[in-house]
Amino acid sequence: MFPLKDAEMGAFTFFASALPHDVCGSNGLPLTPNSIKILGRFQILKTITHPRLCQYVDISRGKHERLVVVAEHCERSLEDLLRERKPVSCSTVLCIAFEVLQGLQYMNKHGIVHRALSPHNILLDRKGHIKLAKFGLYHMTAHGDDVDFPIGYPSYLAPEVIAQGIFKTTDHMPSKKPLPSGPKSDVWSLGIILFELCVGRKLFQSLDISERLKFLLTLDCVDDTLIVLAEEHGCLDIIKELPETVIDLLNKCLTFHPSKRPTPDQLMKDKVFSEVSPLYTPFTKPASLFSSSLRCADLTLPEDISQLCKDINNDYLAERSIEEVYYLWCLAGGDLEKELVNKEIIRSKPPICTLPNFLFEDGESFGQGRDRSSLLDDTTVTLSLCQLRNRLKDVGGEAFYPLLEDDQSNLPHSNSNNELSAAATLPLIIREKDTEYQLNRIILFDRLLKAYPYKKNQIWKEARVDIPPLMRGLTWAALLGVEGAIHAKYDAIDKDTPIPTDRQIEVDIPRCHQYDELLSSPEGHAKFRRVLKAWVVSHPDLVYWQGLDSLCAPFLYLNFNNEALAYACMSAFIPKYLYNFFLKDNSHVIQEYLTVFSQMIAFHDPELSNHLNEIGFIPDLYAIPWFLTMFTHVFPLHKIFHLWDTLLLGNSSFPFCIGVAILQQLRDRLLANGFNECILLFSDLPEIDIERCVRESINLFCWTPKSATYRQHAQPPKPSSDSSGGRSSAPYFSAECPDPPKTDLSRESIPLNDLKSEVSPRISAEDLIDLCELTVTGHFKTPSKKTKSSKPKLLVVDIRNSEDFIRGHISGSINIPFSAAFTAEGELTQGPYTAMLQNFKGKVIVIVGHVAKHTAEFAAHLVKMKYPRICILDGGINKIKPTGLLTIPSPQI
């Protein structure tokens, strides 16, 4: 969007038509409210940016089908020129006509027709240039079908529009209706407006509405519309004095038959504008972040660099986009409904005043005044920015231009920098409501994203702090590594040819996050359908599973006007976190995933694991929807956003920790209940504190050795070829180097049945060497777990017999032979190392042996005794022998 500059923000309101409550659609579901339909169609208007159009910003849905639209606004309009009752100069008229046509032409390219063109909807900015307002009303209301008022103003309606009359469906079923108005109807409206400017007065003021409409239709019988209009209003002398170019323009605009009337595009190329058109440079839309065109192609610096600062004033807020300013206005306490109430646009009516005077038994009423609130109030209320500016008065100018090369730039400088630093430690929900904090975060992320992928590392770094909601969609795309010509790729996919999956998609979409107004709109359903179908068609080796729609929902919501980016994000997300989950036969993938999850529960919470296993409440009964949809099926979108902000910073094993964190929030209830109660508990999942869940997930992840979550069906490591601009550091709370190469010390794949038989996870020899700090190998260092403490990070328990232990063992390990480790009651045999094992309870304990069955049984015994963080060395002591790291105790003399 363009910067706010000298413009203002305005709001206007109207009601959508109410639908009967007892009528269902053809699919058997309740009818979608018209306000929801309008809200969905409105979204595309936010993407239409042009210097001659007022930028649409937002739409808000209120009670009783009320809608409030926020858009760019200017106080002056052509209405003000007409109030002066003086003819406007011909040169000005031609410039106004050309600028209006520029706006109309651009709208038409996007399939939009104004239909409500009038002097008060043609605004003038501070420099006197034209901006068309309310140009999307006809589009968003489905050509007027979804509202109880006509779109347009009688004096300016084209004859063909009047001839069609007002069409209103009453049976809520498809029926034949007239074709919508085309671009040529706006040309007629422009002709009437230009005529009024030329003569300095408004037309048809002495006629009532029905007479105006009749008069306009009778123009079909005259030879010269222009002369008849001039004679009717007593201004023939003024018209005759106009230059030939202006007369020619008016005649072309006021051609009665639309087939002979030019379109805005044709009219702009007409010779009447031969002197005006060279004064304007054609508008080129700036390249977006993920476009195939070169973003810096039109970036040129002036010869005199000081010219850049010439027009700089102290109003830095005006340099931000109108979308950002509106977002901050809302955070600073802006209330749309309150603004409209203050201007008496919204008026409350006592309920007793709405009662009818007379009522029949069949419900027919009489004597009830017409409710005029359903009609259009055309007033636009200017939204005051005083409260926002007052809130940001202490923010220095340097905060609007952070230095990206500065190490301290993660919190931009301002007069209240200490407050910002303090704000960064506050709970996320408070930070997201802090106006000054969000301003700084939005500006910083905006700058970083404009430098993507060059600034990819810094985006990762800043995302660890938090992601501003306004920038979440693009930030997620950057974290997922989306690059390239995503629009060309998406457009090349066939989304129209019927495929067998279509029926299932049609069934799933009306059940997917339909509490959300945007996703429940028909426009949202259509976008869902296209994105899901594009994914299915472009991945022939995978299939559509129920749950894919839920997975798509966050990406579609954040990129509602950019289906290509939603598709690209989804296509990058699934291989990373759900590799091969959508195979036709995915049972082996899911079973391995659930087994590893079960081991993670035992690793972090053995007491809970023991209880769930005893009652037979296995992950297969509750966790498949969690992981197949990455929790989007069980949490609402606002919780998913905060959860995925962190998920996208971790690797493919982080979801295990989220799952364990959810169970730990329900821990007391799970431990106190049996199988049936647990089933009921998960059928309607209780409220989960997402911020706590994220915090605990990170803590669990830090305690988990990177190889403990190894899966043979995970995404294979990608070859490391990222020499510049890529992310070279590990995921932030991860002990994992990104995609480490497989070595002899890595974990080996084992059959699924063997994996299921083991309660505790295995860790690789790499992890053991790294965590024991037995050698200094840069490849295996874990940056997030470094500590200055000399205390060991884990305890190695060697369960071989004492003779084997003496021949060579891991430095610092203790020996508890398996054969004599436990009593008949399952308790640990008291020995010299029992106390040490007890002291290490709560830290990572690695069981090492040379018989896999024995190590698994020993680990299972410790889990039964509620020892957390128990794991097994994959491959046993034999994996360590080739490294030369085994030590032999000095002989005692």
Swiss-Prot record:
Region (Disordered): 710-749
UniProt domain Protein kinase: residue ranges: 1-273
Annotated Rhodanese domain residues: 790-889
Molecular function, one GO term: protein kinase activity
A GO cellular component entry from the record: mitotic spindle
Biological process per Gene Ontology, one example term: regulation of TOR signaling
SMART domains attached to this UniProt entry: RHOD, TBC
Rab-GAP TBC domain location: 466-651
Compartments it resides in: Cytoplasm; Cytoplasm, Cytoskeleton, Spindle; Midbody; Early endosome
Keywords for the protein's UniProt record, in alphabetical order: Cytoplasm, Cytoskeleton, Disease variant, Endosome
Main location per the UniProt record: cytoplasm
Bias kind Low complexity: ranges: 720-729
Disease: Hypotonia, infantile, with psychomotor retardation and characteristic facies 3: An autosomal recessive neurodevelopmental disorder characterized by profound developmental disability, intellectual disability and severe hypotonia. Many patients have seizures, and show brain atrophy, dysgenesis of the corpus callosum and white-matter changes on neuroimaging. Non-specific facial dysmorphism is noted in some individuals.
Entry domain remark: The protein kinase domain is predicted to be catalytically inactive.
Assembly, per entry: Component of the FERRY complex composed of five subunits, TBCK, PPP1R21, FERRY3, CRYZL1 and GATD1 with a ratio of 1:2:1:2:4, respectively.
Functional note: Component of the FERRY complex (Five-subunit Endosomal Rab5 and RNA/ribosome intermediary). The FERRY complex directly interacts with mRNAs and RAB5A, and functions as a RAB5A effector involved in the localization and the distribution of specific mRNAs most likely by mediating their endosomal transport. The complex recruits mRNAs and ribosomes to early endosomes through direct mRNA-interaction. Also involved in the modulation of mTOR signaling and expression of mTOR complex components. Involved in the control of actin-cytoskeleton organization.
Similarity annotation: Belongs to the protein kinase superfamily.
Listed name of the protein: TBC domain-containing protein kinase-like protein
Source organism of the structure: Homo sapiens (Human)
Classification of source organism: Eukaryota, Metazoa, Chordata, Craniata, Vertebrata
UniProt gene name: TBCK
